[in-house]
């Protein structure tokens, strides 16, 4: 398959994946299409207890994953693109099971921030905004933070973003995502909130020497 929209729920922040869901998607005649009949959604066990903080978000209990296959048994399908809301988090999670997984990452969170800069950007808020607070949206959102529901809501938001940007193929979507992920302002440190182009050159030089520098921030700093 060419692309999947994927979401994970983890046992703790940046933890083991205990629920993984994905749905195949593609562009047909220039329109983003998802195959709802092919949704994958499974629970997995892990070697550590689910934190109560994580439990409060996704409502997955120890009893839900008892007797389930280990997360280590998961293998992502071969695909060229992987799409998700803050997709880097999900890629990190599934690589705990499948370290060799590789695909071009498309981040709907970055795209939403670019297209709707003045809105809240979590999936639930975006769905409410795009449906003008409809009852149908509320019905769907009440199940949000279930991985399966999250991929379906992400697909809904992404279809509208593609329409707003005139995107008609997956490679163009990827390129828009790459551009959207390059920050225009610094989000931490002594110059937090400052436009990248206005950061003093000595601070830029220092940042560029940091070993854990975000690759997209690095692009922004080099571009200036």
Residue ranges and their predicted role:
Residues 1-113, 117-145:
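Conserved non-catalytic scaffold segment of RNase H-like nuclease domains
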Residues 11, 146-157:
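Acidic, divalent-metal-coordinating active-site segment for phosphoryl/phosphodiester hydrolysis
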Residues 83, 150, 154, 193:
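A residue-level signal for conserved active-site and pocket-lining positions in enzyme catalytic cores
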Residues 88, 152-155, 201:
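Generic alpha-helical structural signal
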Residues 145-146, 196:
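Short amphipathic alpha-helical interaction segments
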Residues 157-224:
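Acidic two-metal-ion nuclease catalytic site recognized across multiple nuclease folds
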């Amino acid at each position: 398959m060419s692309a999947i929209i994927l979401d994970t729920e983890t046992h703790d922040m940046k933890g083991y994946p205990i629920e993984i869901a994905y749905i195949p998607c593609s562009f047909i005649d220039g329109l983003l299409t998802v195959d709802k009949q092919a949704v994958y959604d499974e629970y997995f066990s892990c070697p550590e207890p689910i934190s109560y903080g994580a439990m409060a978000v996704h409502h997955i209990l120890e009893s839900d994953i008892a007797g389930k296959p280990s997360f280590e048994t998961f293998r992502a399908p071969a695909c060229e693109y992987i799409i998700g809301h803050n997709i880097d988090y999900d890629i990190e999670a599934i690589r705990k099971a499948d370290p060799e997984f590789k695909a071009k990452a498309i981040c709907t969170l970055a795209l939403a921030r670019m297209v709707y800069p003045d809105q809240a950007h979590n999936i639930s808020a975006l769905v409410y905004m795009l449906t003008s607070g409809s009852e149908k949206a509320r019905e769907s959102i009440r199940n949000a933070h279930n991985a399966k529901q999250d991929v379906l809501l992400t697909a809904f938001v992404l279809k509208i973003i593609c329409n707003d940007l005139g995107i008609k193929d997956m490679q163009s979507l990827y390129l828009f995502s790459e551009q959207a992920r390059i920050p225009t302002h610094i989000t931490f440190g002594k110059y937090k909130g400052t436009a990248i182009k206005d950061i003093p050159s000595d601070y830029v030089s220092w940042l560029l020497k940091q070993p854990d520098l975000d690759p997209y921030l690095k692009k922004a700093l080099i571009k200036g």
